[in-house]
Amino acid sequence: MDKLKVGLISLGCDKNRVDSEIILGNVKSAYEIVTDPKLADFIIINTCGFIESAKQESIDTILEMSQYKGKYNCRGIVVTGCLAQRYGIELMELLPEIDIMLGVNDYDKLVENINNFISDKQNKIHNCGYSDLNINEGKRILTTKSHTAYLRIAEGCDNYCTYCIIPKIRGKYRSRSIENILQECNELSLRGVKEVILIAQDTTRYGIDLYNKKMLPELMRSISKIEGIEWIRLLYCYPEEITEDIIDEIALNDKVCNYIDIPLQHISDNILKLMGRRGRKKDILRNINELRKKINDISIRTTIIVGFPGESEEDFKELKNFIENIKFDNLGVFKYSREEGTRAYKMKDQVSEELKTAREGELMMLQKHIIYSMQKYKIGNKYKVLVEGKKEGVWYGRNYAMAPDIDGVIYIKSKKELKVGTMIDVKITNSVEYDLVGVVYDESGK
């Protein structure tokens, strides 16, 4: 008898991507995994429920895939992830197209639930009770390029920012043990992974719950000893938790990329206080200055929220001036999303959607000009580049300052075939918006 075919659609952030990889790892022994949902008996949709646009994308995807029932092979729609965890049975009542629903803690029950649905001919299965997630990631099926993997070092969050629903969805902050992480790292290395990207809701607090102290520097040091791992990249670093020890480890450890992602959200002390952020402008400036003093080629990425309740014209001007002066290497701007269940939802002085959009556009245009002015100084530089593949016949890759999917790439001119997943030296010859253009160094004539 042929195995059931299962397809998966993953929405949302890279932390959700890791969940999707765990789901695929859990079902691979029981079912055949297909990439085309038209061929799937069951379609799993791993949803995001963080902000309004993400919720709408999840709902639209559920409705679109539900049309495959009767039209193609689909016998059932399975909904997992943050949207399922956030709304539970309410979501199932709203969308009767859903047959099976699992929260963020129940991925190990997926095969059992699908089998029960088939054998018992049950109409619905709902399984979204809360319990601490088993943070042993298990045997994932990587959905990234074979040489790069996201490595989740902790789950949950204790920060409780006033705009954020994640602690209610994902629970308290829980670190994985160093031993568990290193075991997975060794396995990833044996599979050909060269770049591990450390992620969590807050990577800088790693270890505080397990070891009663923050252990991120020790973790990075341990990972760097694993043969085959060449790049360690840090995302989601809470600004006030960036200690001198973390900065020193980035500066001194050759395998840790001189790159850091710090979601600042704002710079006005007034807005930071309303957001429930612990640090203030002086703390942020101190840490940025310390990073740049100790690591002269550090690449700093950040994300900003505009239109938070109470954001005045003065607050926005302060934010704009800050971005203009600091000149981040990469920056993302998001419009504040008013989410039920958060403290900010009930705040006065909500900003109009029109003004949010205008402020978002203004900051993105500013960042575009900043990038243009910074890129020209990279022409003539030589970088170690991780070869990623080809786009329209042109090789491309990334250097230490480029995280996958969210930052730019380097297009590589080469007279010979390159091997995906290898590191090569590239001399930069030009820039195109957020991307760079270069030539293989030994072909550049120096």
From Swiss-Prot:
The keyword Calcium does not apply. Residues 376-442 form the TRAM domain. It catalyses: L-aspartate(89)-[ribosomal protein uS12]-hydrogen + (sulfur carrier)-SH + AH2 + 2 S-adenosyl-L-methionine = 3-methylsulfanyl-L-aspartate(89)-[ribosomal protein uS12]-hydrogen + (sulfur carrier)-H + 5'-deoxyadenosine + L-methionine + A + S-adenosyl-L-homocysteine + 2 H(+). Binds 2 [4Fe-4S] clusters. One cluster is coordinated with 3 cysteines and an exchangeable S-adenosyl-L-methionine. Its cofactor is [4Fe-4S] cluster. GO terms for molecular function: 4 iron, 4 sulfur cluster binding; aspartic acid methylthiotransferase activity; metal ion binding; protein methylthiotransferase activity. It comes from the Bacteria. One of its GO terms (cellular component) is cytosol. SMART domains: Elp3. It is found in: Cytoplasm. Residues 143-373 form the Radical SAM core domain. Residues 4-119 form the MTTase N-terminal domain. It is an enzyme of class 2 (transferase). Its main location: cytoplasm. InterPro entries: Elp3/MiaA/NifB-like_rSAM, Methylthiotransferase, Methylthiotransferase_CS, Methylthiotransferase_N, Methylthiotransferase_N_sf, NA-bd_OB-fold, Ribosomal_uS12_MeSTrfase_RimO, rSAM. This is Ribosomal protein uS12 methylthiotransferase RimO. It comes from Clostridium kluyveri (strain ATCC 8527 / DSM 555 / NBRC 12016 / NCIMB 10680 / K1).
